[in-house]
Amino acid sequence: LVKDANGNWYLRSQTGAGPDPCVVDPSLPECVPIDPVDPVEPPPPVLRPEAGAYLANQSAALNMFAHRMHDRGPMTAPGDDRHAWARVGRGNVDFSAVGGQLAVDGTTSLLQIGSDVLRTGNASVGVMLGSGRADSSVVSRVTGYSAKGRVRGTAVGVYGTWSQDADGTQGAYIDANLQFGRFDNRVQGIGLEPEHYDSRMASASLETGYTFNVWQGTASALYVQPQLQLSHVDFRADRHVESNGTVIDHADAGGLSGRLGVRVFGHGTAAGNTVQPYLGVNWLRGSGTSTLQFNGDTLGADVPRNRYEMQAGAELKLGQRWGTWGGVSVQRGDHGYRNVGGQLGLRMAW
């Protein structure tokens, strides 16, 4: 509504000012450039240490009953005698989880027994039983809060071995085993009620190697044994709902893993009690997957895909029917991964 010079009123319609051309096209020559502003990334969420305890339990169950041929004692046992054996082992592992936010320290104890049920010439078939326990402590590097995890497991399995040479001191060998395990798991945070859930695994392993006699003396010999082992683990865990409503499911772990190494050992040729020392070096290649989902968010353990192992120990032959062995091993990997273990075993021919 506009009043003109004669005092008359009338309506006027007109366009307003257009948009700023520098807003429409900042590249125009008359426009002053504006420095871009980097987007602000939200800080990573602070996680409860209980998440690391669930992941530690999963890792412990996967590796508790991992089995190699030499875990059943020395190959150098000629004849058609069947053998019964037993071994105890203990290990300590340190690794991180969820991008290094959580520190995991765990110990595992194992008892495994077995016996040949069929032995003929260069081949044997047997059964084995195992029982183990793992305890872990998880501390948040951000808050300092902690949680604990525990796994109790049992396993049953079968194994079979064939060697080109009857006493296993020359030529090729093939070893295989199948195992089935069940685990009772427990997780507890500070001031919280314990959480219980079940898991299970099925594993298959195939190992092969070749033994070379590199030195022969009058009463002893030295051997080099390259080894290759492939293993597959199918791991399953029950869907679990915590008392606070958190849902833990979609366990993704296990899969195919491999081991490539060499074992150097001495072997006495004299009768009676004989000590046979050995050294071993291994490259361990894992599946690289160890995750769980917490309310739909996937979290993982920082267990390296590549690990490197050193072994040392000795086997003691006690006459014709008894033998014992013991050894230690150290594994190292990225992200501060460390695993130190040892075992003792006893073997009897019958």
Regions found by a protein language model. Give the residues of each.
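Extracellular/surface-exposed low-complexity segments
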Residues: 1-55
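Outer membrane beta-barrel translocator domains of Type V secretion systems
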Residues: 34-216, 327-330, 334-343, 347
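Outer membrane beta-barrel transmembrane domains
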Residues: 154-157, 247-350
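Surface-exposed loop/turn motifs in large extracellular/passenger domains
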Residues: 170, 200, 221-223, 274
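Hydrophobic lipid-interacting interfaces of membrane-associated proteins
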Residues: 181, 233, 284-286
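Solvent-exposed flexible segments
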Residues: 208, 222-235
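Solvent-exposed loop segments that connect transmembrane elements
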Residues: 240-244
